[in-house]
């Protein structure tokens, strides 16, 4: 059954050929225009030391009609004029803000320059990407150098595109009087979509830096009745290798947090406490197996859900691994 589902998904979501190609650094990252009513930018950094544990900058321009990515009742004004911003970490749990694109944001049409009040600025040039984020509890300065390793999650021509490029990054993370400088791996992401009321009800996206050169992504999207829309793992490294894996995919929540979280629109969301996932290689043998325990540091503002971190142990390519993973979680079932 799993093979049949993955085949059907592949006929709709045409990413197979794209995921065999290196990243084209001239790829458009334009702001909303024409049919593309929703645009998303993201920078995610897993496996940071305490007190940060993780950092993300999530930008959604426009108010999505898909229930996991937008809630039009929360828009302060015109839903199409709303910019939804999260600068999240374990020390910035209240990093979510909403802005008027026309009155409070400064953006170039090509997406090379993005500024949202005094909270977040992202600039992209031929030489790299810079980020500056500021909240009352913390500030972050990052320089990203994109590699040629890219993972395409979605390519439905004329409807939806979503990709993530592996980046080498160096930055300073400051909380109060404490400051740390870190060289690490992170992601730079872009998505654009026609604003359709797609009935997606569950979404998780997880990022692990398993060593200094290798990053693993896991993602799962479910529709009504638990119908899988997208699921699998992506492995990429700084030398440009990037592979996609769906064979033997499993994802299980063993225990939920005792207290549900209440979103700004009043939805009570179950959050994972203990969970695991795995995927096999093309030969059917174990490729990666993960056991995770949430750090209970979820920050609201990832679409209509949360982002946070978890401690994990497991195996990758027959070797033991452990670290702090990044997790996005939206459950509107």
Where are these regions (language model features)?
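Structured soluble/peripheral alpha/beta segments that form catalytic or ligand/cofactor-binding pockets
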Residues: 1-333
